[in-house]
Amino acid sequence: MPREKKKRGRRAEKSQSKRKREDEEVSDSPKRQRTTNEDNDALAGDDYIPLDTHDTEKEQEQGQEDDTPFYGLLDTEEQEYFSKASQTLELNSFEDDDDKRLFIESVYTEAKGKELKIACSQSCSRLMEKLIAMSTPAQVKALFEKFSGHFLHLVQHRFASHCCECLFIRAAPIVTSEMEKPKDKKKDRKQTIETNGEDGELDEPINQKPAMDLFLGVVSELEGNWGYLLTESFASHTIRVLLLILAGEPLADHSNARVLASRKKENVDSITSTAQAELTIRESRQVPAEFNNTLRKMISDLSAGLNSTYLQALATHPIGSPVLQVILSIELGCMGKEKVKDKSSVFRRLIPDDTLETKEEGVNFLNSLFYDPVGSRLLETIVRVAPGKFFKTFYKTVIRERIGSLARNEIASYVVIKVLERVSREDLQSAIESILPEIPSLVQRSRLNVIKTIIDRSTVRSADTTSLAKALESAYGEDGLVRLKTILGVEATDKDAESVKPKAATSAQHLHGSLLAQSMLQAPGGLATMIQTSFLAAPVEILIQIAKNPTASRALQEALKPSKSNTQFRRQLLPRFYGQMCDLSLDNSGSHVADALWDATSDLVFIKQRLAQELADNESALRDSFLGRAVWRNWSMDLYKRKRGEWMSRAKGLDNTRVSAPTADSSAEPAKSKLDLARARYAARAEQQEKPDSREQGPRGKKQALSAPSGLLKAQ
């Protein structure tokens, strides 16, 4: 049977309630009914907190949407064109740089007047990021001016905020270049006008603002809104970049990378950036004095009205805490000791001067940060950049007695790593003794970061690691083969490894194990011996399996590095690779081990000859493979087949250069004997006596005679 038509949802309920109200008679009730006006009055009151805020939140969202300007949408043809342009830039299949430059100019011409639409478009905002990364300084500044006046809304937009961030990073080196060569730019402009005429096109229009003024305009545009931008999910990323640019800090540094962007962000710069651009953002930059003044004012405005309680709450805020980390790193690292002593600074408001020694509240706050996933990041920043006096008090009061239990915790261990990187040799030795009882549990749970840091810092500080080596040997067992399999994670056979794809957590454990083995090999004494004996205990099949593992092969390459202390170890290990050179050379990871065998046999030439002969016997297979050809070239096998004597001298290290013989300077004359030098001096004197008027010949002849013995000594 056909069903009766019924309206569903809120519309049906609304119509039913309306009919009921129309049918029912209005009855006077003795109770006072709350009206909508009274509801609004109550909502307007300061002390009233409504329980049902669903409607209010909707109104606020609608109000925010109304405040945000709408820049329009791209039509279908425009979206299709810009999508194809994005794919073309990603493929980067241009014939030359001029072809690429012309294509970028054509895209800019097509995007003229649509820049804001593209930046706010979900499908085309990535094109804007790629364009910015490939643009010239003049194009970057022109786009900067297009965005000016709209930054307050763009930095809060889900897609446009990434374009703003990319624009700031690309424009930061332009500020430094304009500071360094302002006069040269004027000369270039005059020369361009003289060459092209007054109507000729310039690479950089004369009426463009300097990049410094563009950045100052952004700060003034955002001024007065720092309070809510600090914890805004999209704007906070842009604020962090802006702070680092004003301070002249590196934008691609490892310590700053985690506070600039999340792990989920697509790395567009890896596709588009050049080596020179990458170098400019990895280094500290010189900034004008106006940036320093603006930075101080910006930090004071950001923290204005934030008392100690609010700052401590901000320390564990997932969005506000990274901004606080950048502010603290700038205050403690760039603004000098005077700013640290200032009671109005963010650092002193967060942690007062007498907190650690007299007040328990401050100590409790710092203790709570150890176990918080967000707060521990802030604590790492404080440990890394805090003044020495504060760090010593902090270590003595908070960390020293409980460093063992902190190292055992999954989150607090990262703070312990930063502490170990900064302590003195005596404190490091006492910290090792405190952490030793936790070594078995750390090994069992594969928490190897702390152990690796202890080994690295002990190598730098020349601390004693005998007790640590014994603890690791007891934790991993005395059997060398089992120990090696456990550390490097090679328990599965090759067939199992091919069929089963490793999980991310397992891969991370294997990576930490490989890094631990490399650190142990670099440390002197029993730690290196423990890994070396494990490699010697492994059969050939396990060694080849390790060599073909992309993670574990790094440890094997480290073990093969030649040094005076491991000559006997290499003499015993290298014959295990007889008959395996072709197999290793054709593998992606094994080819790196094959390359490492060249340096490993630098003082064992008879082994190097045997391995080179194996490569020569499998020449056809190696030449058919890209990896094999690379190994053939690195082992100088063409020289081995044609000029065995030159190859032997290179194998013995007498000729360290791996350049072919024709590239050498053929015009160099052979070294003269002492008799030839004496004859040259005699001839020079005789020539000088025959031509007494010549003033240049005497000194020149004398110079040749005196410089020849030094050249002879160099040749000998």
UniProtKB/Swiss-Prot annotation:
<feature type="repeat" description="Pumilio 6">
    <location>
        <begin position="576"/>
        <end position="613"/>
    </location>
</feature>
<dbReference type="GO" id="GO:0005730">
    <property type="term" value="C:nucleolus"/>
</dbReference>
<dbReference type="GO" id="GO:0000447">
    <property type="term" value="P:endonucleolytic cleavage in ITS1 to separate SSU-rRNA from 5.8S rRNA and LSU-rRNA from tricistronic rRNA transcript (SSU-rRNA, 5.8S rRNA, LSU-rRNA)"/>
</dbReference>
<dbReference type="InterPro" id="IPR040000">
    <property type="entry name" value="NOP9"/>
</dbReference>
<dbReference type="Pfam" id="PF22493">
    <property type="entry name" value="PUF_NOP9"/>
</dbReference>
<comment type="similarity">
    <text>Belongs to the NOP9 family.</text>
</comment>
<dbReference type="GO" id="GO:0030686">
    <property type="term" value="C:90S preribosome"/>
</dbReference>
<keyword id="KW-0539">Nucleus</keyword>
<dbReference type="InterPro" id="IPR001313">
    <property type="entry name" value="Pumilio_RNA-bd_rpt"/>
</dbReference>
<dbReference type="GO" id="GO:0000472">
    <property type="term" value="P:endonucleolytic cleavage to generate mature 5'-end of SSU-rRNA from (SSU-rRNA, 5.8S rRNA, LSU-rRNA)"/>
</dbReference>
<feature type="repeat" description="Pumilio 5">
    <location>
        <begin position="534"/>
        <end position="575"/>
    </location>
</feature>
<feature type="compositionally biased region" description="Polar residues">
    <location>
        <begin position="657"/>
        <end position="666"/>
    </location>
</feature>
<dbReference type="GO" id="GO:0000056">
    <property type="term" value="P:ribosomal small subunit export from nucleus"/>
</dbReference>
<feature type="compositionally biased region" description="Basic and acidic residues">
    <location>
        <begin position="12"/>
        <end position="37"/>
    </location>
</feature>
<feature type="compositionally biased region" description="Basic and acidic residues">
    <location>
        <begin position="52"/>
        <end position="61"/>
    </location>
</feature>
<dbReference type="InterPro" id="IPR011989">
    <property type="entry name" value="ARM-like"/>
</dbReference>
<feature type="region of interest" description="Disordered">
    <location>
        <begin position="1"/>
        <end position="70"/>
    </location>
</feature>
<feature type="compositionally biased region" description="Basic residues">
    <location>
        <begin position="1"/>
        <end position="11"/>
    </location>
</feature>
<keyword id="KW-0677">Repeat</keyword>
<feature type="repeat" description="Pumilio 4">
    <location>
        <begin position="397"/>
        <end position="433"/>
    </location>
</feature>
<dbReference type="GO" id="GO:0000480">
    <property type="term" value="P:endonucleolytic cleavage in 5'-ETS of tricistronic rRNA transcript (SSU-rRNA, 5.8S rRNA, LSU-rRNA)"/>
</dbReference>
<keyword id="KW-0698">rRNA processing</keyword>
<feature type="repeat" description="Pumilio 2">
    <location>
        <begin position="305"/>
        <end position="342"/>
    </location>
</feature>
<feature type="repeat" description="Pumilio 3">
    <location>
        <begin position="361"/>
        <end position="396"/>
    </location>
</feature>
<feature type="region of interest" description="Disordered">
    <location>
        <begin position="179"/>
        <end position="204"/>
    </location>
</feature>
<feature type="region of interest" description="Disordered">
    <location>
        <begin position="656"/>
        <end position="716"/>
    </location>
</feature>
<dbReference type="GO" id="GO:0003723">
    <property type="term" value="F:RNA binding"/>
</dbReference>
<keyword id="KW-0690">Ribosome biogenesis</keyword>
<protein>
    <recommendedName>
        <fullName>Nucleolar protein 9</fullName>
    </recommendedName>
</protein>
<comment type="function">
    <text>RNA-binding nucleolar protein required for pre-rRNA processing. Involved in production of 18S rRNA and assembly of small ribosomal subunit.</text>
</comment>
<dbReference type="InterPro" id="IPR016024">
    <property type="entry name" value="ARM-type_fold"/>
</dbReference>
<dbReference type="GO" id="GO:0030688">
    <property type="term" value="C:preribosome, small subunit precursor"/>
</dbReference>
<feature type="compositionally biased region" description="Basic and acidic residues">
    <location>
        <begin position="687"/>
        <end position="699"/>
    </location>
</feature>
<feature type="repeat" description="Pumilio 1">
    <location>
        <begin position="110"/>
        <end position="145"/>
    </location>
</feature>
